[in-house]
Amino acid sequence: MLMPKKVKHRKVQRGRMKGKATRGNFIAYGDYAIQATECGWLTSNQIEAARIAINRYIKRGGKLWIKVFPDKPVTEKPAETRMGSGKGSPEYWVAVVKPGRVLFELSGVPENVAREAMRLASHKLPMKTKFVTRKDFEQTGGEVNEG
């Protein structure tokens, strides 16, 4: 699973997800990508499940780039524990995703194969996504439209 090797702070506050993505909101490496259209937390397990789904469909062809990294620890308290007595221990890692963020990029495969691979991956993700191509970004500038 993806997680940072070293962190400055072991526990962080939950925070709020406001506005659109200002970074990582364009296709940098591949020809096709999936872009988030709503905000949410993406766990390292969900990223791995989507990666496996894409790789299984494209088999040996193409190259995949994962554009998000889970760098936020989420803490949980043990079951049946009374309130209080401090913050729980870090259980898993998440990537904070805002609308417009490009999650995965793919190249070296035909568009219909990329579209189906990204569709399979999007079923593993907890947020709505859309399939985008490099050509779309050149025409629209990568603006996120809901729906």
Curated annotation (Swiss-Prot):
Subunit structure: Part of the 50S ribosomal subunit.
SUPFAM superfamilies: Ribosomal protein L16p/L10e
Gene it is expressed from: rplP
Lineage: Bacteria, Bacillati, Bacillota, Clostridia, Eubacteriales
Keyword rRNA-binding: yes
Pfam families in the cross-refs: Ribosomal_L16
Entry keywords, A to Z: Ribonucleoprotein, Ribosomal protein, RNA-binding, rRNA-binding, tRNA-binding
GO molecular function: rRNA binding; structural constituent of ribosome; tRNA binding
Domain of life (superkingdom): Bacteria
Listed GO biological process terms: translation
Function per UniProt: Binds 23S rRNA and is also seen to make contacts with the A and possibly P site tRNAs.
GO cellular component, one term: cytosolic large ribosomal subunit
Family named by the database record: Belongs to the universal ribosomal protein uL16 family.
InterPro entries attached to this UniProt entry: Ribosomal_uL16 (IPR047873), Ribosomal_uL16_bact-type (IPR000114), Ribosomal_uL16_CS (IPR020798), Ribosomal_uL16_dom (IPR016180), Ribosomal_uL16_sf (IPR036920)
UniProt-recorded name of the protein: Large ribosomal subunit protein uL16
